[in-house]
Amino acid sequence: MKRFAAALLALFMLTSCGTAESSLPEPETVAEATYFQQDREQLGELESGYIPVNFEHMTGEWFPYMGYEEYMHGRSEEEFRASVRERYSEAKSDGVNTLYLHVHPCGDAYYRSEIFPRGVSWDGDYDPFAVMLEEAHELELSVHAWLNPLRCQTTEQMDGLPDSFTVKKWTENGIAKQVNGRWYLDPSHTEVDDLLRQCIRELITNYNVDGVHIDDYFYPTAETDFDAAEFAESGSADLGEWRRSNCTRMVKAMYSEVKSCDSRVEFGISPQGSINGNYNSQFADVRLWSGEKGCCDYIVPQLYFGFRNETCPFAETLALWESMTCPDVRLVAGLGAYKLGKADKWAGAAGENEWIESPDIIQRQIELVERSSAAGYAIYK
């Protein structure tokens, strides 16, 4: 680990922005990061078909849909395959063992779906997710299909969809609601749970996924008019508690569907790093989700804060997440390498320039995570 940490520090100091060129350290020992190979081989003797690959020590990297416009749109299958092979090989060489690949970012699909329309960057006649899976598994990387449960298309994109799609129909009956030019599903409706179950079943049935992963897009607004009619009809007294219960019901439905399809496939959640922000702004009850069995297998709080952040200093915030994560849930620390070389205007005066002044900040955060009770880290570049 020390050899790779030193390489990481050197590379950060050579790059002004610290973007995709960063190098991540390998876990300290092979044993910590070895997926359960013996179990996998034993299961393979008993069962036919794919055996999901997951790692005890997770070192993850997100590959968001925004990049698809660059290396998917207008590309042949061969060109796309070469691009993802290069990216995943770089991740592998950086010590990454788990990829979160965006397949359902905005009410759409970057896989062959009978439920959702194609993503806007997918214009080829090949299946991009099949290609991504093949290339990742060839490198012995674990692949978690990354979904955004509630975020849908922009107003313009939705207007262009055929009326046959469920998400389009829901714009007419209030299950989907518009906020700042984009549509979002309202989790107070149990029909949303059913749609997400279908999505998960479609993915696990048709693709050799190792996990399903969601991030921090829960309620898009704290404004009371978003779901005023539904709240009034519910008879609940506390809007915040009611919204949190809606999100928890949805999360548990997704977890249950994953395990129903294949108990060996993992389900993970990556909420924002601020515990209070989760609880009061997005109505994500992360204390509950990380604190008891049945909501997720692992949780990846986005700890995109410097050590000098005045609101959520990294070390103290990591410790808070450690204290509330139970033994049945693995804590993985999300690290914001995309901030390197940039001012952080939300960090307060003490931390605003930390990502500029401290090019070794990610390396130091990794070292702290490795000394903590967390089961790994994940990088957002």
What spans do the regions from the language model cover?
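Acidic-and-aromatic substrate-binding clefts and catalytic sites of carbohydrate-active enzymes
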Residues: 69, 77-79, 104-109, 122-123, ...
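Active-site-adjacent "subsite" loops/lids of carbohydrate-active enzymes
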Residues: 44, 51-81, 144-202, 206, ...
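Hydrophobic faces of well-ordered beta-strands that scaffold small-molecule active sites
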Residues: 59-63, 99-101, 143-145, 212-214, ...
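Catalytic domains of carbohydrate-active enzymes, especially glycoside hydrolases
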Residues: 82-108, 206-211, 295-298, 369-376
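Substrate-binding cleft of secreted/luminal carbohydrate-active enzymes
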Residues: 293-313, 320-321, 327-381
